[in-house]
A protein has these predicted regions:
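Positively charged n-region of N-terminal signal peptides that target proteins for export
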Residues: 1-5
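Bacterial N-terminal signal peptides
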Residues: 7-17
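Short, solvent-exposed loop/helix junctions and linker helices
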Residues: 24, 68-70, 101
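Axial heme c-ligation environment in periplasmic c-type cytochrome domains
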Residues: 57-60, 65, 74, 78-105, ...
């Protein structure tokens, strides 16, 4: 009986700890699919779709000094409503009809991890 309890407890613990990393992996997949094409897989603004013809460079999420100036509300708004929603580039598309509110919040948290910064 105690062997069963120990095995069950260990399995439950592993499952719960894997859930957090699964969510992190899912968020990375979201970022890679929707954001990395322009912002780069490292978030440095050097995505594979960026050309010299871009009117402006995509935001470098790893630049902590710049990203600290951006409020969470502004970043959330840009993800949902596109660049023009905060007077930024129209090349940044709106994802509000595609992503859930929870996914937008997950991407926001992921972006904050990339810059290792806090909102203003």
């Amino acid at each position: 009986m105690s062997r069963f309890v120990i095995t069950t407890t260990m399995a439950l613990g592993l499952a719960l700890s894997a859930g957090g990393s699964a969510q992190a992996a899912d968020t990375k997949q979201l970022f890679d699919f929707y954001c990395a094409q322009c912002h780069g897989t490292a978030g440095d603004g050097k995505g594979i779709n960026v050309t010299k013809d871009f009117a402006t460079d995509p935001r470098n999420f790893t630049n902590a000094a710049d990203m600290e100036k951006r409020s969470d509300d502004d970043i959330r708004s840009v993800i949902k409503d596109g660049g023009p929603s905060i007077s930024k580039s129209p090349l940044m598309p709106p994802w509000g009809a595609t992503l859930s509110a929870a996914e937008v919040d997950e991407l926001l948290a992921y972006i904050r991890k990339l810059c290792k910064c806090k909102a203003k």
